């Protein structure tokens, strides 16, 4: 499994209250079936800066929740996070501090690290999105194979039927990109718009759908924001 990134290689776990769960998992996808249980265990650790808004749903009092947001528990929404109109939180979702979950974005069974952004028309299921990672408008993390078979990563069987993406800290995904089930993207890597990604992309790269280049100031633009 040498080409599959370990949890500590993708994520700085200081930027999520799911730290204890993730540190128990050598590979981050091992945490995906345990997200709901983790969230429920965290409820009793939340202080009075969180409000229980309904059964199994806790939202930081300084979070911004716009009208038209639907939240199903168990869910925790962190401090100064913004949930924009039409966001659909389907349960087993932990969103950290300072994150943005945008218009018509749908989340299910996810850990979203602090300051991550899923701001426009994104679907992210059975996934982990790292610190300050960003998915541009319409980028999708597909979590289920068409044939419903278990998902493998670089030939290694995960034993998971549903597994979307592990998106490393500071990684960027361009508009309209599709991340196939079981995708793992390294820290600070950039994915061009309209690209399909499958498997593992290492950190500090730029992927245009055909080739990987080292991330340098002269080959990085901001057109996917």
Language model feature labels by segment:
Residues 49, 67, 118-119, 157:
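Short loop/turn motifs at secondary-structure junctions and domain boundaries
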Residues 1-56, 61, 188, 194, ...:
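Terminal amphipathic alpha-helical/low-complexity segments used for targeting or macromolecular assembly
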Residues 13, 31, 75, 81-83, ...:
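Functionally constrained cores in energy, signaling, and assembly domains
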Residues 1-5, 41-46, 60-62, 90-99, ...:
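Phosphate-binding glycine-rich loops and adjacent basic patches that engage nucleotide phosphates
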Residues 2-7, 53-54, 70-72, 82-83, ...:
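Short, flexible segments with low predicted structural confidence
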Residues 18-20, 112, 119-225:
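Glycine-rich hexapeptide-repeat left-handed beta-helix
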């Amino acid at each position: 499994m040498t080409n599959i990134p370990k949890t500590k290689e993708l994520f700085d776990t200081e930027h999520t209250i799911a730290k204890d769960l993730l540190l128990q998992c050598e590979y981050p996808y091992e945490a995906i079936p345990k997200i709901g249980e983790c969230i429920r265990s965290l409820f009793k650790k939340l202080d009075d800066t969180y409000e229980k808004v309904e059964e199994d749903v806790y939202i930081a009092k300084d979070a911004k929740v716009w009208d038209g947001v639907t939240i199903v528990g168990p869910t925790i929404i962190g401090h100064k996070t913004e949930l924009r109109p039409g966001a659909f939180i389907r349960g087993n979702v932990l969103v950290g501090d300072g994150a943005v979950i945008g218009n018509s974005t749908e989340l299910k069974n996810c850990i979203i690290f602090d300051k991550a952004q899923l701001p426009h028309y994104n679907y992210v299921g059975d996934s982990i999105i790292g610190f300050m990672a960003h998915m541009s408008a319409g980028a999708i993390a597909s979590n289920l194979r068409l044939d419903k078979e278990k998902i493998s990563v670089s030939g290694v069987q995960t034993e998971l039927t549903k597994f979307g993406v592990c998106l490393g800290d500071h990684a960027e995904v361009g508009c309209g990109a599709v991340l196939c089930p079981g995708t793992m993207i390294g820290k600070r890597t950039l994915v061009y718009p309209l690209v399909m990604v499958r498997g593992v992309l290492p950190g500090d790269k730029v992927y245009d759908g055909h080739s990987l280049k080292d991330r340098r100031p002269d080959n990085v633009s901001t057109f996917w924001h």
